[in-house]
Amino acid sequence: MNLIPTVIEQTNRGERAYDIYSRLLKDRIIMLGSAIDDNVANSIVSQLLFLEAEDPEKDISIYINSPGGSITAGMAIYDTMQFIKPKVSTICIGMAASMGAFLLAAGEKGKRYALPNSEVMIHQPLGGAQGQATEIEIAAKRILLLRDKLNKVLAERTGQPLEVIERDTDRDNFKSADEALEYGLIDKVLTRNTEDQK
């Protein structure tokens, strides 16, 4: 059962009920709290575009607790984060794994955060293929190209040499918040909610 909390806000015109995600969106906060598929990506991209149209000068925050998911869906979010004018800060709560970790690192440099007990996991893309040999070969070439593309972006976002990223993403590589900071995936481990993260 998916229960979405409702909050009541008092205004001079009376009370107004919001689902919690709509209320957070008013404060320019987007929640990425699930696996990343096309539906999730479309929702996140729509929220980013809406917030840019509302105020292109004001930062946006994305809170991430995600096991990862589809590369193409994640890249749609990544490209939109880079495309829009507002700076996008990212905050890891719980776990940012796979494409979730990639999006965490994709936040505005200096505005990528993690809570102290959160974890980050990076690895190479997962995929599979079936069918005729030529179809399997096409799929294998594509996943290798995607791996190279993701590794290059991670190297640029973290400041790590490409060879280090290639080695470290060869298998599941879990990092604590402090290790993610040292590696360059984030810029600060948050212990208190402060206005400087927005």
Swiss-Prot record:
It is found in: Cytoplasm. GO terms for molecular function: ATP-dependent peptidase activity; ATPase binding; serine-type endopeptidase activity. Its main location: cytoplasm. GO terms for cellular component: cytoplasm; endopeptidase Clp complex. One of its GO terms (biological process) is protein quality control for misfolded or incompletely synthesized proteins. The keyword ATP-binding does not apply. It is an enzyme of class 3 (hydrolase). The keyword Protease applies. The active site is at S98, H123. Its EC number is 3.4.21.92. It catalyses: Hydrolysis of proteins to small peptides in the presence of ATP and magnesium. alpha-casein is the usual test substrate. In the absence of ATP, only oligopeptides shorter than five residues are hydrolyzed (such as succinyl-Leu-Tyr-|-NHMec, and Leu-Tyr-Leu-|-Tyr-Trp, in which cleavage of the -Tyr-|-Leu- and -Tyr-|-Trp bonds also occurs). Pfam families: CLP_protease. Keywords: Cytoplasm, Hydrolase, Protease, Serine protease. It comes from the Bacteria. Belongs to the peptidase S14 family. Cleaves peptides in various proteins in a process that requires ATP hydrolysis. Has a chymotrypsin-like activity. Plays a major role in the degradation of misfolded proteins. PANTHER family: ATP-DEPENDENT CLP PROTEASE PROTEOLYTIC SUBUNIT. Fourteen ClpP subunits assemble into 2 heptameric rings which stack back to back to give a disk-like structure with a central cavity, resembling the structure of eukaryotic proteasomes. This is ATP-dependent Clp protease proteolytic subunit. It comes from Bacillus velezensis (strain DSM 23117 / BGSC 10A6 / LMG 26770 / FZB42) (Bacillus amyloliquefaciens subsp. plantarum).
